[in-house]
């Protein structure tokens, strides 16, 4: 669990930024959002397939974009 030690010379903004950075690094917010609603195997598979299609189309777009310059 992330936690910070408050220093005497730190103001609130700096210490809040350090705490927020630690929570982002530990993926606490994303994990909490994922656990908020139960996701079935079919939903996970569907999301994975959509993400893989999106990734493939992005690669194809980049390849075609740089192919025209050659």
UniProtKB/Swiss-Prot annotation:
HAMAP family per record: Ribosomal_bS21
UniProt KW Cytoplasm keyword: no
Gene Ontology CC annotation, any one: ribosome
Keyword terms: Ribonucleoprotein, Ribosomal protein
Descriptive protein name: Small ribosomal subunit protein bS21
Pfam families, per the entry: Ribosomal_S21
Annotated Gene3D superfamilies: Ribosomal protein S8
């Amino acid at each position: 669990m992330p936690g910070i030690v408050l220093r005497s010379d730190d103001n609130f903004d700096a210490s809040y930024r350090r705490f927020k950075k630690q929570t982002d690094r530990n993926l606490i917010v994303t994990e909490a959002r994922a656990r908020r609603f139960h996701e079935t195997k079919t939903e996970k598979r569907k999301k994975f397939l959509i993400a893989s299609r999106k990734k493939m189309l992005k690669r194809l777009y980049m390849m075609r974009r740089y192919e025209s310059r050659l």
